[in-house]
């Protein structure tokens, strides 16, 4: 049982690390570039109605 929980913990940490590297795990809708600058770090542009930080 300890091995099972260890594997779950490793998977959770890895998934959080991937989300951190790639930005948010969900799409952020926007109308202008200013919307993205408030919602995402690094002031990404708004492309096709979604922020480029995703």
UniProtKB/Swiss-Prot annotation:
Keywords: Calcium-activated potassium channel impairing toxin, Disulfide bond, Ion channel impairing toxin, Neurotoxin, Potassium channel impairing toxin, Secreted, Signal, Toxin. GO terms for molecular function: potassium channel regulator activity; toxin activity. Residues 1-23 form the signal peptide. The keyword Disulfide bond applies. The keyword Cell membrane does not apply. Expressed by the venom gland. It comes from the Eukaryota. Disulfide bonds join 30-46, 36-51, 40-53. Its main location: secreted. GO terms for cellular component: extracellular region. It is found in: Secreted. Negative results: has no effect on sodium, calcium, Kv nor BK currents. Does not affect apamin binding. Selectively and reversibly inhibits small conductance calcium-activated potassium channels (KCNN, SK). Belongs to the short scorpion toxin superfamily. Potassium channel inhibitor family. Alpha-KTx 14 subfamily. Has the structural arrangement of an alpha-helix connected to antiparallel beta-sheets by disulfide bonds (CS-alpha/beta). This is Potassium channel toxin alpha-KTx 14.4. It comes from Olivierus martensii.
């Amino acid at each position: 049982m300890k091995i099972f929980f260890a594997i779950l913990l490793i998977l959770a940490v890895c998934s959080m690390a991937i989300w951190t590297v790639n930005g948010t795990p969900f799409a952020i809708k926007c109308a202008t570039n200013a919307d993205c600058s408030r919602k995402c770090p690094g002031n990404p542009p708004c492309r096709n109605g979604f922020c480029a930080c995703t």
